[in-house]
Amino acid sequence: MQEVIAGLERFTFAFEKDVEMQKGTGLLPFQGMDKSASAVCNFFTKGLCEKGKLCPFRHDRGEKMVVCKHWLRGLCKKGDHCKFLHQYDLTRMPECYFYSKFGDCSNKECSFLHVKPAFKSQDCPWYDQGFCKDGPLCKYRHVPRIMCLNYLVGFCPEGPKCQFAQKIREFKLLPGSKI
């Protein structure tokens, strides 16, 4: 049985392209309908959606990075106007209040993030080098390091007080890594 199931990734189904292109989706009957339970519009994320407010899919901007804790319990009343994500995504779950406040959570089926305080303060060495395979599920902190544009063109008036990285060596490298 496993041989039959394991080989399916090589096959493409005729409807996959239609789903990807959102074919067969009609326009909303009127503007302003609550779409908080709908999927995110693939075309909007690429800047290509022409349906505007009549699109049946959500037009979420990048700021919706954390799942709405009220939506998880079915209590969010803001709908499309909520600043948080209305989609169940384990990689974007909010932090557990009880675990962060008391260091323990008694709910064995808690879906919120349980982040150990020791890991909150440690930067991820892999992210600092450029890529972390664990992504948002990483137990370490991901702090973006941005090169100073003034330094790149020759001179930064802020000098060592500049908040941006000014030398390649300011990016933390793992032992044995080369630039």
Swiss-Prot record:
Disulfide bonds: none annotated. PANTHER family: CLEAVAGE AND POLYADENYLATION SPECIFICITY FACTOR SUBUNIT 4-LIKE PROTEIN-RELATED, CLEAVAGE AND POLYADENYLATION SPECIFICITY FACTOR SUBUNIT 4-RELATED. Belongs to the CPSF4/YTH1 family. Keywords: Metal-binding, Repeat, RNA-binding, Zinc, Zinc-finger. It holds the Pfam family zf-CCCH_2. A zinc finger (C3H1-type) spans 35-61, 62-89, 90-117, 118-145, 146-169. This is Putative cleavage and polyadenylation specificity factor subunit 4-like protein. The keyword Transmembrane does not apply. GO terms for molecular function: RNA binding; zinc ion binding. The keyword Transcription does not apply. One of its GO terms (cellular component) is mRNA cleavage and polyadenylation specificity factor complex. It comes from Homo sapiens.
